Amino acid sequence: MKALILVGGYGTRLRPLTLSTPKPLVDFCNKPILLHQVEALAAAGVDHVILAVSYMSQMLEKEMKAQEQRLGIRISMSHEEEPLGTAGPLALARDLLSETADPFFVLNSDVICDFPFQAMVQFHRHHGQEGSILVTKVEEPSKYGVVVCEADTGRIHRFVEKPQVFVSNKINAGMYILSPAVLQRIQLKPTSIEKEIFPVMAKEGQLYAMELQGFWMDIGQPKDFLTGMCLFLQSLRQKHPERLYSGPGIVGNVLVDPSARIGQNCSIGPNVSLGPGVVVEDGVCIRRCTVLRDAHIRSHSWLESCIVGWRCRVGQWVRMENVTVLGEDVIVNDELYLNGASVLPHKSIGESVPEPRIIM
């Protein structure tokens, strides 16, 4: 079985992290976002993953080719010369996707959840129509594509992209199974699968919804990235508690790479992820943060709701909070306060940032 993952976007919502690394390769809980998806697909029996690539495609290709042998699957690249939306990439990869008559997965690359891929396959085969969409319930459906479907069968009657008035609280979770017949509906041009393809399929009775059980998050922007981390760590607590870290000063759900080092008298957690090579000196307090590979947090600093990029250096007695995001290789000097700062890569910060703003 095959899967197509849409990884061609610029990742603008997750800047400044995506200025130096394509979004699918940004580490989420110590593993690239894309790898969470690919490993789950491989575990469900997918043997060929196609990546619809554009921005920083060489970095993506290099990283995923290295994973091919480890996972025992085939990984192909489908290169977009121009942005093709969310349906155009299917037409571009038509030859690969239609090599067999089997249905195939399509995934948005921003999504993290428990990935019920085997259950999706069973659901799709049971109803026998052209398309299956994974849906989830949210409190603010107006930001998403909303699905109106039959409660017992899942047959979708309407598919409304970002409705202005309340239609339903079930939204498109960004994961589909489609039969090859769907490819005949899509032309090789910029096309939205949500606005142009799914509404027609729903009208013809060819689209069904399966409701996701468990957590779900679109982690495409920093505040949602941190919320997704909290949900993921709680899921680990329930299913794989042995993967979480415990020890002096550890509070709640904390994930620590074995190569990270934590000093004395620290308070780490709840909801913290420390990546490979991270150094946390004595007396540091970190809550609800992701600290990426080779970052260094010096003594007595206090971080809450932050993303610290690769190889950053945070000085002594620094306070950072309110979804402060440091791009790659940022230096924050001693005794500064950063409130909601978004700092571009390779910057050195010499004065406090008391109000949320972008540091260029």
From Swiss-Prot:
Stretch forming the signal peptide: none
Binding site for GDP-alpha-D-mannose: 110, 218
Alphabetic keyword roster: Cytoplasm, GTP-binding, Magnesium, Metal-binding, Nucleotide-binding, Nucleotidyltransferase, Transferase
PROSITE patterns registered for this protein in UniProt: HEXAPEP_TRANSFERASES
Stated role: Catalytic subunit of the GMPPA-GMPPB mannose-1-phosphate guanylyltransferase complex. Catalyzes the formation of GDP-mannose, an essential precursor of glycan moieties of glycoproteins and glycolipids. Can catalyze the reverse reaction in vitro. Together with GMPPA regulates GDP-alpha-D-mannose levels.
A Gene Ontology BP annotation from the UniProt entry: GDP-mannose biosynthetic process from mannose
Gene that specifies this protein: Gmppb
Cofactor-binding details, from the entry: Coordinates binding with substrate and required for enzymatic activity.
Gene3D superfamilies, sorted: Hexapeptide repeat proteins, Spore Coat Polysaccharide Biosynthesis Protein SpsA, Chain A
Entry's Gene Ontology cellular component terms: cytoplasm; cytosol; GDP-mannose pyrophosphorylase complex; mitochondrion
InterPro entries cross-referenced by the UniProt entry: GMPPB_C, GMPPB_N, Hexapep_transf_CS, Mannose-1P_guanyltransferase, NTP_transferase_dom, Nucleotide-diphossugar_trans
Listed pathway(s): Nucleotide-sugar biosynthesis; GDP-alpha-D-mannose biosynthesis; GDP-alpha-D-mannose from alpha-D-mannose 1-phosphate (GTP route): step 1/1
Catalyzed reaction equations: alpha-D-mannose 1-phosphate + GTP + H(+) = GDP-alpha-D-mannose + diphosphate
Top-rank taxon: Eukaryota
Annotated positions binding Mg(2+): 110
Native species: Mus musculus
Active-site residue list: 162
Similarity comment: Belongs to the transferase hexapeptide repeat family.
Name of the protein this chain belongs to: Mannose-1-phosphate guanylyltransferase catalytic subunit beta
UniProt activity-regulation remark: Enzyme activity is reduced by incorporation into the GMPPA-GMPPB mannose-1-phosphate guanylyltransferase complex. Allosterically inhibited, when part of the GMPPA-GMPPB complex, by GDP-alpha-D-mannose binding to GMPPA.
Annotated region (Substrate-binding domain), positions in chain: 2-222
Subunit structure: Component of the GMPPA-GMPPB mannose-1-phosphate guanylyltransferase complex composed of 4 GMPPA subunits and 8 GMPPB subunits; the complex is organized into three layers, a central layer made up of 2 GMPPA dimers sandwiched between two layers each made up of 2 GMPPB dimers. GMPPB catalytic activity is reduced when part of the complex and binding of GDP-alpha-D-Mannose by GMPPA induces allosteric feedback inhibition of GMPPB.
